[in-house]
Amino acid sequence: MMNDGKQQSTFLFHDYETFGTHPALDRPAQFAAIRTDSEFNVIGEPEVFYCKPADDYLPQPGAVLITGITPQEARAKGENEAAFAARIHSLFTVPKTCILGYNNVRFDDEVTRNIFYRNFYDPYAWSWQHDNSRWDLLDVMRACYALRPEGINWPENDDGLPSFRLEHLTKANGIEHSNAHDAMADVYATIAMAKLVKTRQPRLFDYLFTHRNKHKLMALIDVPQMKPLVHVSGMFGAWRGNTSWVAPLAWHPENRNAVIMVDLAGDISPLLELDSDTLRERLYTAKTDLGDNAAVPVKLVHINKCPVLAQANTLRPEDADRLGINRQHCLDNLKILRENPQVREKVVAIFAEAEPFTPSDNVDAQLYNGFFSDADRAAMKIVLETEPRNLPALDITFVDKRIEKLLFNYRARNFPGTLDYAEQQRWLEHRRQVFTPEFLQGYADELQMLVQQYADDKEKVALLKALWQYAEEIV
């Protein structure tokens, strides 16, 4: 990988298969990654490995039906999560690596952060330290469809809307992807999509790659002038190609990586007519519960999450027509907003109060409760450098209340042999609180229902039976 004595930049394409959809409360099953050079030529060996589930967790049946990976298979082929985390960490922290996948910003990266959090690695540094970065090809595909669709076949789903599912895109473009939802197959498919866009739409590809960087994005955002931009985001919905013209009203009052945008294609009357309390309530009301009320056409754009933003004229008139975006309506709304600067204060007030949030007392769900201090981070590094068998004798104090609980869970899940009698009892009590009679009854009912639903599908029934056996074995 050396090149003129300097480390070359590489892409690390990766994908997780997990035992459920919740990045903090569910667990990883399999990880796959391939490193490529800047032209997407494979460097080194493909990496695939499994994670052994700990004994305080049962997989979501629906996830196992999708991936086909049973907890028994993960246990037989896998290593404990501490070792699993260490391998991923060493891949992700090679300098000048751009870590990417398909829908990773919203899913896989959250899985990574939570794995690192549970296993005493910095949850964030991998994506920025040592010239590293992250990127996500899902929004690249969405942007390509909306802004420069030529040269690529765009499949539709059953509703006649564009589909950005990896297996649909690969099929429509004649790319081999026989084993969807196998992590390695998905990684190869993602590399193939990257090559396709780079070949067919090189200027768009290079623009989006450069603008994965938050400092580059910041340069596009002009709040005082409310300068309009084109924004591509899954939040807008496939019915309009996930695209709209937006205008920046203000920076978020607390999160310096978030800018408050108005969707210019929306109905802006609520912003003019309602006060900030009413707007906040409506913003956090599900669309289905709004009734006749107009939605609040405001969204946060997080510049550290690789959002797609570009100059307004990047969306050509013919593409706006194809996507059903009314340019004149957007221009009219922009004019009204510029004439009503008081709207800025209202939207800042909406976000000045935190989003309704129920704190969890489960330490696994507390990644976002705050950053760790330097002293605690140094102490966590010592935990990693200590032989597991010496962890019980480790005499360090932590300031953050989470760390003692994390350390206990880390030992109990990965190195149960290091627990003394009192600690074994504490872990047993923890497992009793997880596997309550109500939880187990609900789990059994779900398996039963799925067995009936898939009675004719031998493979699925076998997976469900394996889950039943696994539950009986560990509970």
From Swiss-Prot:
Q: Where does substrate bind?
A: E17, R165
Q: Where is the Exonuclease domain?
A: 13-192
Q: What is the effect of changing L331A?
A: No effect on ssb-binding and on ssb-dependent nuclease activity
Binding-site residues, Mg(2+) 2: E17, D186
Question: Where's the ExoI SH3-like domain?
Answer: 202-355
List residue numbers at the site (Important for interaction with ssb): R148, Y207, Q311, R338
Q: How does it assemble?
A: Monomer. Interacts with ssb (via C-terminus); this interaction stimulates the exonuclease activity by recruiting the enzyme to its substrate.
Q: Function of this protein?
A: Degrades single-stranded DNA (ssDNA) in a highly processive manner. Also functions as a DNA deoxyribophosphodiesterase that releases deoxyribose-phosphate moieties following the cleavage of DNA at an apurinic/apyrimidinic (AP) site by either an AP endonuclease or AP lyase.
Q: What is this protein called?
A: Exodeoxyribonuclease I
What organism does the UniProt record list as the source? Escherichia coli (strain K12)
